[in-house]
């Protein structure tokens, strides 16, 4: 598989870092795969290989472009199975909501939460994978830089929609209300959705695209996004 060849190229035998590189790449691939599902229109005119690439640089300065969608991980298990278990059902709900409702505001909030989670790969990996000191700080910085870049992009678009009066969840909430009437959605969940919607619009309006400060998404804001999607936050 292409991805294994690229991981090999990135690996420094003296550092014995292949398992770490492979694990980081696997997690990055999954996040970008989900991101692509939520935002298929961003690269709709690109060829698959152009849509699905991710650059990894290691301490030995060998860049690697890996194909995002591939059938098996380094452990010969389907990639999605490994990472859906790691992340939980929340992102599945985000993906389903984005596809079903085709609402750009929903997609942006889902994408924001996904980009926020890029750096969480280290929390998962540190418990199961040996992280070489020579790679840890460098790769952490790369993931954080990527996370900040994507969050700024999504927040900027969210602010544009909110300031222009184009961020409106009425249609989405009406659909959810019908589900309550049909008995397929808990009224308490709809209540949380209704409470979250105006707060998230205010949050989007408050973003300052000219600020040079690090973007931080508070836990309370993350919880509001979960509430909007009807997902119970584990935090």
From Swiss-Prot:
Which species is listed as the source?
A: Escherichia coli (strain K12)
Under InterPro entries, the record lists: DUF2713
Write the protein's name: Uncharacterized protein YjbM
Q: Which Pfam families match?
A: DUF2713 (PF10897)
